[in-house]
Amino acid sequence: MIENRDVVIITEFDGTKIVVINDIVFKGKQNIDWDNVKEYLKGYIGDFYEISESAEKIYIGSKLSDEYTNSEARKALRGANAKAKANAASAIPELIQIASNPKWEENRKIKHNDMAKYGWYRYDVKFAIPVYDNEILIRYNIYGARLLVNHSHNGKKYLYDILEIKKETSKPHHFAW
């Protein structure tokens, strides 16, 4: 378990939950050190977290850190979306907790036959990253994403990656709580 994280869950007026990441662990947009992100994620291995709306347990296995940092989807990310994915690593427990709208799909790749014997699930999540100007917080950018979870041969579900990270184009949020 990784400690000393400054992450909270808030609920919007419509009931949508957003994970607010208050502490930027991985700074910069251009040159994120993905090896540091990989090492950070290893701190979760062996943990499990529960999805609030379904009480399903999602485990963190040893494959997460490599897939999260080296997947083709990650390599395609640039700028703010890459920074958002890197910093979402600090909010894995809360992102799992707010996961909603599960979509199941059959495993289609032979190489995943064991680890995704019972298929894949994609869950919707939202998170917020602070934007600073000269070290003064000016707003939060909101991102939507999908948690990719494999349903393994042992019956457990494991977080495999976070995909489809997209900045919301609505007006930026100024949270007050």
PLM region spans:
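Ribonuclease/tRNase effector modules and their secretory precursors
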Residues: 1-177
